[in-house]
C-alpha cells in the first residue's frame, strides 16, 4: 500500500481538505440558521 507515497498522499489530502470544507460549510450554515431563527 505504501509503494507510491505521492499518489496515495494526494487523494488523502484532497479528501481531508474537502472534509474540512464540508465541516466549515455545515458550521457556517448552522450559525446562520441559528442566528436567523433566534432573531
Swiss-Prot record:
Protein known as: Photosystem II reaction center protein L
Family designation: Belongs to the PsbL family.
Transmembrane segments: 18-38
Coiled-coil residue spans: none
Function, in words: One of the components of the core complex of photosystem II (PSII). PSII is a light-driven water:plastoquinone oxidoreductase that uses light energy to abstract electrons from H(2)O, generating O(2) and a proton gradient subsequently used for ATP formation. It consists of a core antenna complex that captures photons, and an electron transfer chain that converts photonic excitation into a charge separation. This subunit is found at the monomer-monomer interface and is required for correct PSII assembly and/or dimerization.
Subunit structure: PSII is composed of 1 copy each of membrane proteins PsbA, PsbB, PsbC, PsbD, PsbE, PsbF, PsbH, PsbI, PsbJ, PsbK, PsbL, PsbM, PsbT, PsbX, PsbY, PsbZ, Psb30/Ycf12, at least 3 peripheral proteins of the oxygen-evolving complex and a large number of cofactors. It forms dimeric complexes.
Membrane topology: Single-pass membrane protein
Amino acid at each position: 500500500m505504501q509503494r507510491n507515497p505521492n499518489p496515495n498522499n494526494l487523494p488523502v489530502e484532497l479528501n481531508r481538505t474537502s472534509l474540512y470544507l464540508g465541516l466549515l460549510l455545515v458550521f457556517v450554515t448552522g450559525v446562520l440558521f441559528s442566528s436567523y431563527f433566534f432573531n
